[in-house]
């Protein structure tokens, strides 16, 4: 799929299903089914309910997506990568 045909959005994993499929609630309130990308499978990146993730959605089907990045949490519990230093 060309990179021009995807929409990147952030969300939170709400439910883990079988076969590396997750129910993700996006920041705009929509719920979608998302699978782990091949690169995340290859590197054994584990995902759990409550994790913040970046999801790529196809412009042709906005109900399914691919999880491409898991956001790390710092010790304070806020998102890392916000640009603020403590």
UniProtKB/Swiss-Prot annotation:
Protein name: Translation initiation factor IF-1
Keyword Disulfide bond set for record: no
InterPro entries given in the database record: NA-bd_OB-fold, RNA-binding_domain_S1_IF1, TIF_IF1
Function recorded in the entry: One of the essential components for the initiation of protein synthesis. Stabilizes the binding of IF-2 and IF-3 on the 30S subunit to which N-formylmethionyl-tRNA(fMet) subsequently binds. Helps modulate mRNA selection, yielding the 30S pre-initiation complex (PIC). Upon addition of the 50S ribosomal subunit IF-1, IF-2 and IF-3 are released leaving the mature 70S translation initiation complex.
GO molecular function, one term: rRNA binding
Keyword check for DNA repair: no
Native species: Pseudothermotoga lettingae (strain ATCC BAA-301 / DSM 14385 / NBRC 107922 / TMO) (Thermotoga lettingae)
A matching Pfam family: eIF-1a
S1-like domain location: 1-72
Keywords, sorted A to Z: Cytoplasm, Initiation factor, Protein biosynthesis, RNA-binding, rRNA-binding
Gene3D superfamilies: Nucleic acid-binding proteins
Signal sequence, start to end: none
Cellular component terms per the entry's GO annotation: cytosol
SUPFAM superfamilies membership: Nucleic acid-binding proteins (SSF50249)
Subunit structure: Component of the 30S ribosomal translation pre-initiation complex which assembles on the 30S ribosome in the order IF-2 and IF-3, IF-1 and N-formylmethionyl-tRNA(fMet); mRNA recruitment can occur at any time during PIC assembly.
Family: Belongs to the IF-1 family.
Subcellular location: Cytoplasm
């Amino acid at each position: 799929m060309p990179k021009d045909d995807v929409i990147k959005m952030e969300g939170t994993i709400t439910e883990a299903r079988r076969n590396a499929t997750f129910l993700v609630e996006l920041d705009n309130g929509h719920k979608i089914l998302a699978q782990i990308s091949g690169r995340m499978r290859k590197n054994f990146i584990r995902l759990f309910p409550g994790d913040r993730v970046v999801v790529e959605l196809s412009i042709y089907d906005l109900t399914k997506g691919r999880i491409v990045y898991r956001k790390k949490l710092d010790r304070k519990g806020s998102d890392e990568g916000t640009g603020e230093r403590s």
